Amino acid sequence: MSSMQFGAATEFSNKCGVTLMNTPIGRVVAEVMGAKEGVELTEYPSMIRVDGVKLLSFDYDELTEALGEEFDGSIFEEISSTHYGRMVHLDDKTMLFASPEDAAEYIGFDLTAK
């Protein structure tokens, strides 16, 4: 776990992230995500920051297996609060993209339109 750094920067960070409630479910989700390459966790008494480079993918089957109980989009919404990056909800996962262009195919954004 790392410490939070505050400040302002004008360059593109290529990062995305979400704040999870520090509950039994939130903790397991954070641990699963923290084991992935490029993902950093920052723990606070009531919340856990999950930050990643380019893309965070919360796979519901993977999280269901880790929890030992069903995990879906409604539970993700329940344990998460703030986020940064483009969030896309699908039936089997929630994804956060650092760049809206990377999310274009999921959100119906035409990169070639003028």
Curated annotation (Swiss-Prot):
Matches recorded under InterPro entries: MOase_MmoB_DmpM, mOase_MmoB_DmpM_sf
Induction comment: By acetone. Transcriptionally activated by MimR.
Residues in the signal sequence: none
Domain of life from the UniProt record: Bacteria
One annotated GO molecular function: monooxygenase activity
The family this protein is said to belong to: Belongs to the TmoD/XamoD family.
Subunit organization: The propane 2-monooxygenase multicomponent enzyme system is composed of an electron transfer component and a monooxygenase component interacting with the effector protein MimD. The electron transfer component is composed of a reductase (MimB), and the monooxygenase component is formed by a large subunit (MimA) and a small subunit (MimC).
Known role: Effector component of the propane 2-monooxygenase multicomponent enzyme system which is involved in the degradation of propane via the O2-dependent hydroxylation of propane.
Protein name: Propane 2-monooxygenase, effector component
